[in-house]
Amino acid sequence: FATEGANIAFTDLVLNDDMAAGLEATRKEIEALGVTCRAYAGNAADFEETEKVVKQIHADFGSIDVLVNNAGITKDGLMLRMSEAQWDAVLNVNLKSAFNFIHACAPIMLRQRGGSIINMSSVVGVHGNAGQCNYSASKAGMIGLAKSIAQELGPKGVRANAVAPGFIETPMTAQLSEEIRKDWMKKIPLRRGGQTEDIANVCLFLASDMSSYVSGQVIQVDGGMNM
């Protein structure tokens, strides 16, 4: 987004000095690309806190044209062994946060008579995954939320879509055993994992006018794993 000239506002949960330093480091990295970037500390799962953050962002930037809902955690476990706390934590961060931000940003976009909302889902939100019922449910919810918002806000020019990444090469997936990685690759026709840039490129398309007639859709970025 920044390389295409978009000004960036992003939020993250800050619980200690190290997290605050990470927030500032990311802000500087983005701003070095020649755009305005501001970082905001906040708990996306908190409804009132999110409203305050969005009001501040709107005051600082003057408009909110694109919203990417990308907050996410995992607390995996088989359903019968999963605690209520595990379920609630994942649904609150992964799904409720998206509702909170959409609820706060939608009035601004409606007044602007335009905007693009992008929900980060997952292929497990499409077909499920054993041991991840909470995560799968949250990501399926992101799809349903995007489709519903697309219908509600579409008449005023606001679009909403979901992106469903598959196996993406990240520091988290790099920690998986070689056996698990090989098993994943067998399921992917392209026989490789995706890169974070693959996801960013699809989000950039959905944010831009190139997708001005695309709304209520789920774009799977998974190398053909889920057809």
Predicted regions and their residues:
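Alpha-helical segment proximal to the catalytic Tyr-Lys
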Residues: 107, 151-155, 212
